[in-house]
Structures are given as C-alpha cells and as structure tokens.
Amino acid sequence: MPVGAPINESHQILTKAIGWGRGGGHLDGLKAVGDRLRGLKKDGTYNRGFTAFAVVYLNKVPKPYCGNFTVWPESHRVFEQHFIEHGHEILDDHMPHVVMPEPPIHITGDPGDVVLAHHQLVHTGAPNISSNIRYAVIFRSKGVLCEEVGFDAFTDIWKEWDGIREVIHKARSN
C-alpha cells in the first residue's frame, strides 16, 4: 500500500479475554468468527481476503497462558488436504472439525517480536491467567496475487508464494 493511501479495512481491538471457544482455534473469515473485523464478508459468506498475517507483540509474553498468539503446527497443510478432499465450500457453513497432528503452541516473545503466519494456519489467542494484559498488533497482508488466486489458495496453499513453491519443488526433487 502506498504511503498516505487511505486504509479501508476495519480495525480490531479486543477488549475481553479470549477463551478456547469450541476447544480449538479458527481460520479468519468464517461465519463461526461472526464479525467483519476478522474477515467475514458483508454478505455473510466466508472470505480469504489476505495472504499472510503478522502478530507483533508490544509487551513481553514470557510463558504459556499469558494471552499468547497460539498456533496449531502443520494445520495449514492439514486443511489444504481436507479442502482437496471435501471442498473449501464447507467453510460457508462452519469451521470444520479436523484432528490436528500436533498440539497447539503458545508463542512466547518480547516486545517487537513478530510472528508471520500463513492465512490457513489455525490460530487463536490463549487464555490469559497472568496479571498482565497482553498487547499485540495484528496485520493482515494481501499479496499482489491474492484476489487472482482467490479460493484456489485453500487447496494449493503456496499458489501465490513463488519463492516457497520453488523451495518445496527442489526439496521434493532431492
């Protein structure tokens, strides 16, 4: 985005503790989330309006259960396969219940630390049982091919990531 360009996206400020909800994380842009601030389109359908997102910690998050940004490793690949088998259209109804290969990881960090995550990585905010408020800023970036690739990225997660595609191709060739 050019410097000085107007920002047309909504901003998100969470003012209450985030729990585990249905016992797991989520993908942004689904009805289960229920608000446009996290990517739900105005017409109520699911959306993939960004390529990756960044979470920037503004204060120290020293250990688990401090409101940590929490991710399920490999979930982007698990959901890629799930959407290949069942279609991404199931997202219009709900967040699919899929068994994750690994437990969630509470990401710890210091002020200024940045976590970059793929749009299809299952994530949430962990409960915060510490006496400190967890402050973070979340950015969603839209790659230049995001709109062109559209929903195809659900079943080909690296479709708009040329550099990553090349690395994966080379690794599989060896």
Q: Which stretches of residues belong to each language-model region?
A:
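Short edge-strand/loop segments of extracellular domains
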Residues: 16, 72-79, 140-146
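Conserved double-stranded beta-helix
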Residues: 1-68
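Short, surface-exposed loop/helix-turn segments at secondary-structure junctions
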Residues: 27-39, 85-103, 152-156
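Double-stranded beta-helix
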Residues: 48-51, 59-122
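Non-heme Fe(II)/2-oxoglutarate
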Residues: 84-90, 97, 111-116, 120-174
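Alpha-helix termini
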Residues: 15-17, 39, 80, 86, ...
